[in-house]
Amino acid sequence: MSIIGAAVGIGAQDTRCRQGPDRLQACGLMARLADEPHGVSWSGTVREDTGVDVVYESARFCERLARKVYDALQNNPRIGVVGGDHSCAIGTWSGVYQAIAGNGPLGLIWIDAHMDSHTPDTSPSGALHGMPLACLLGHGPGALTGLGVSGPKLAPQHVCLIGVRSFEPAEAALLQKLGVRVFDMDQVRRHGLARVMDDALAYVQKNTAGFGISIDLDAIDPHDAPGVGSPVSAGICGKDLAESLSKMGRHPGLLGLEIAEFNPDKDVNNRTAKLVIDLLAATVGLRG
């Protein structure tokens, strides 16, 4: 696995999550992953430029990130991206999409307390980290929906959300109209995360060339992950998620894992940083 830092905060109201990749490095990310027998490498950090036009700067950043992801997948079977606000997902999965072009569609499991499916017309805040899934599905600013290759990078029937518990009606309406599968937090509590992840895996690997997992850390309960941009109570157990990722990591169709919205300034005793490292370690087959 090739690990890439996505040092971006321009898409969020609290921009301090741009510090996430550097803090993870300082907390021993690569030292922990060094024992992985098949090799885990650090491919560098893509950093945002700041400017007045947020959409323009975000598109420039995502273009660079997509290129980095694409290049990494030419020499590695999988990528890991650590952020950084969740607008980085537009770059991450655009890069994966381009890397597998011609082999088939991309499947994606989106683990998040929010739907991230606003458009500029529906977003109360205008923050781009509330729009990345909509952009990947082809709904949003042209500079972001047309990243790399024009058109949607994801088909609705190959996407599912897990852990949703905070959203606006316009987002739900868009996803319902498109037919995107949503496992909300009530379903996770009712059936257990392991079963929901199994169902999601079966869904996104059907008729696809491979699948990815995008995690917004606010999907996790704030007790386990306090260092996030937009915490929402009553979330997924961090340990349960690590166990599920350990299983997912053994699946040959997994193309990449993205972990976004780590805000070091809100962390408590590096609890969130350690959890991010544990999640990556579980995915590459290392025990805690």
Question: Model-found features: residue ranges?
Answer:
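Short, well-ordered beta-to-alpha junction loops that form the rim of enzyme active sites
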Residues: 7, 83-87, 113, 164, ...
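Active-site glycine-rich loop that binds ribose-phosphate moieties when present
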Residues: 127-169, 195
